Curated annotation (Swiss-Prot):
NCBIfam families: PRK01076.1, rhaA. Belongs to the rhamnose isomerase family. This is L-rhamnose isomerase. GO terms for biological process: L-lyxose metabolic process; rhamnose catabolic process. It is an enzyme of class 5 (isomerase).
Length: 419
């Protein structure tokens, strides 16, 4: 440890102690908050099912930065490189299309055995795994409908895919000793004016009930459902709207997924957390950065990321909120994208843990909004960076921007050699 870092740490401890914050306790609490990294940043949501297939479902990955992963071995190597540069507990979030098999596997036939390499890798890297059925980029989703499809046979295919995915998810939890959160998102919707908005939602309701009919130990598997305002090609009507899934999660007591990019640009999910927690047992968060639409830019340490972290910490939702990331930027180094976004999420959590929340809550309750605002602003200037650097040091990860040296070396020696 450098003398400069030690001096900054000691000064930071004193500054935060003056406002009633124990920085050691803040770091202990930060180690209770894993962030689930999403595998699909590493290959632009391509997966291993059909490397020649196109990305569909109203989502889009833009850019053509060289070096994207072409197979599971490369993707895991890239993830390991990123993991080494991010302090604290982490998880990995997989989509069904990241299965491994020597022969083609239909999506309704996926099994735990197709993900055994991921489980062994997760064990070696001390990671939990989360999961998602992939209800897009498939011939049977080409017309824009999956679980709400009017054709019963096609609808059943997607029901069976989701049921098979739940078994994979439960396998993850059983093998790794930590529950896998499996999130269901479907692209179902219509481009233009829709006459019958009810029938697809009725079909979706019945399909979801069939999907979750098999019971699993919640210590191994947790169901989550995710809404969206619109997607490309589904601008006018989305079957799985916010109201639909809020009602579903409340009535079925599943987890509800809130994606930062899945609402109107003037809405923020930080404001939805406390409302939803009154009705659902758990929340899954997809922290992202929408730029004018659900563009899935890399997460910044911006006001909304900070507000999301603050809501989790202020209301002590550590055991009820699962933090995941969801962005995919193909215009920059993909390993760097993981590192930037995940470190920013963890920085936001640390800053929230360093807030004198009890004092601020008392001021609010007494109606002293002037001092509340003043202290919230003064809090931003306290030396949280020194606490962050100590956290990085204790987890043997680079401080500051030093991690870039490792990424540049990896790009030169590994990524640049991929065609």
């Amino acid at each position: 440890m450098t003398t400069q870092l030690e001096q900054a740490w000691e000064l930071a401890k004193q500054r935060f102690a003056a406002v009633g914050i124990d920085v050691e306790e803040a770091l202990r609490q930060l180690d209770r908050l894993p962030v689930s990294m999403h595998c699909w940043q590493g290959d632009d949501v391509a997966g291993f099912e059909n490397r020649e297939g196109s990305l569909t479902g109203g989502i889009q990955s833009t850019g053509n930065y060289p070096g994207k992963a072409r197979n599971a071995t490369e993707l895991r190597a890239d993830l390991e490189q990123a993991l080494r540069l991010i302090p604290g507990p982490k998880r990995l979030n997989l989509h069904a299309i990241y299965l491994e098999s020597d022969t083609p596997v239909a999506r309704d036939q996926i099994k735990p055995e197709h993900f055994k390499n991921w489980v062994e890798w997760a064990k070696a890297n001390r990671l939990g795994l989360d999961f998602n059925p992939t209800c897009f980029s498939h011939p049977l989703s080409a017309d824009g409908f999956t679980l709400s499809h009017p054709d019963a046979k096609i609808r059943q295919f997607w029901i069976d895919h989701c049921k098979a995915s739940r078994r994979v998810s439960a396998y993850f939890g059983e093998q790794l000793g930590t529950p896998s959160v499996m999130n269901i998102w479907i692209p179902d919707g219509m481009k233009d004016i829709t006459v019958d908005r009810l029938a697809p939602r009725q079909r979706l309701l019945e399909a979801l009930d069939e999907v979750i009919s098999e019971k699993f130990d919640p210590a191994h598997h947790i169901d989550a459902v995710e809404s969206k305002l619109f997607g490309i090609g589904a601008e006018s009507y989305t079957v799985g709207s916010n109201e639909f899934y809020m009602g579903y999660a409340t009535s079925r007591q599943t987890a509800l997924c809130l994606d930062a990019g899945h609402f109107h640009p003037t809405e923020v999910i930080s404001d939805k957390i406390s409302a939803a927690m009154l009705y659902v047992p758990r929340l899954l968060l997809h922290v992202s950065r929408p730029v004018r639409w659900d563009s899935d830019h890399v997460v910044l340490l911006d006001d909304e990321t900070q507000a999301i972290a603050s809501e989790i910490v202020r209301h002590n939702l550590f055991d009820r909120v699962h933090i995941g990331l969801d962005f995919f930027d193909a215009s920059i180094n993909r390993v760097a994208a993981w590192v930037i976004g995940t470190r920013n999420m963890k920085k936001a959590l640390l800053r929230a843990l360093l807030e004198p929340t009890d004092q601020l809550r008392q001021l609010e309750a007494s109606g002293d909004y002037t001092v509340r605002l003043a202290l919230l602003e003064e809090q931003k200037s306290l030396p949280w960076q020194a606490v962050w650097e100590m956290y990085c040091q204790r987890h043997d990860t680079p401080t500051g921007s030093q991690w870039l040296d490792s990424v540049r070396t990896y790009e030169k020696e590994i990524l640049s050699k991929r065609s």
